[in-house]
């Protein structure tokens, strides 16, 4: 398919979401002709409408299309060189990963898309074949989409961005918390398993760097900034340094975590399973990544936000 040029036309699907709006901004900032797909039936969701209008005022093109209307999807993807999908894969919101199978069909029919980046942006599902129920559904569904992409011979890049900083750092790696306490923290296990934390704006910036890079064609791009590979204890230590105070610490054993998880509803259990694999098993750091697949090595011009810098906003 060859490499793309800097004027590649980009379609973002899910562009009003938590990561999607950052992808739209990164695409515009990079100078791409940017298209944002939205459903025809927005209703009275005023915040979504205002966000779409703000994209338009910044130079983006709004494209009306629906997963329930195959022809509209084909028409939408026919406008661009690159399709980035950021629809939700989070069960506590709306788990929509398999909707992308309709998108794969549309891209295959259109025949013009030079790169497709499906909704991934977390743990690499190809490495989670032994994941626990019920959380493994996220990885299983993403692998179904991957197989469909590859069987359709659609050029792709998968982005594994690990832990969103807003969710993990904001709560000091504690599930169900997105603001750091100044008094107490619960350490998962001994708090020494390392995770990888990435500012969502950096995820978007690295993603847009990758879309026209021949080095990332038909590969997985891992975003693992070296300074952000830290244990929960290290994250807490940085926060304590910022506030000039030691937190009271409680340890939560693996057994107690799993017992508490079983008392939650299905959607909560899915998310907690992911915390379990990251914070008790170290699933993000138990393998090596080739330098030509790691974003901060490929794109040293992107100045990523460190954990220390990120946590300062909460002081």
Swiss-Prot record:
Keywords: NADP, Oxidoreductase. Coiled coil: none annotated. GO terms for biological process: (+)-lariciresinol biosynthetic process; (+)-lariciresinol catabolic process; (+)-pinoresinol catabolic process; (-)-secoisolariciresinol biosynthetic process; lignan biosynthetic process. InterPro entries: NAD(P)-bd_dom_sf (IPR036291), NmrA-like (IPR008030), NmrA-type/Isoflavone_red_sf (IPR050608), PCBER-like (IPR045312). PANTHER family: NMRA-LIKE DOMAIN-CONTAINING PROTEIN (PTHR43349:SF47), PINORESINOL REDUCTASE-RELATED (PTHR43349). Reductase involved in lignan (-)-hinokinin biosynthesis. Catalyzes the enantioselective conversion of (+)-pinoresinol into (+)-lariciresinol and of (+)-lariciresinol into (-)-secoisolariciresinol. Abstracts the 4R-hydride from the NADPH cofactor during catalysis. Has also a low phenylcoumaran benzylic ether reductase activity. Knock-down mutants of PLR_Lc1 show unequivocally that (-)-hinokinin is synthesized via the (-)-secoisolariciresinol/(-)-matairesinol pathway and not via the piperitol/sesamin pathway. Dimer. This is Bifunctional pinoresinol-lariciresinol reductase. The lineage of its organism: Eukaryota, Viridiplantae, Streptophyta, Embryophyta, Tracheophyta. The gene is PLR_Lc1.
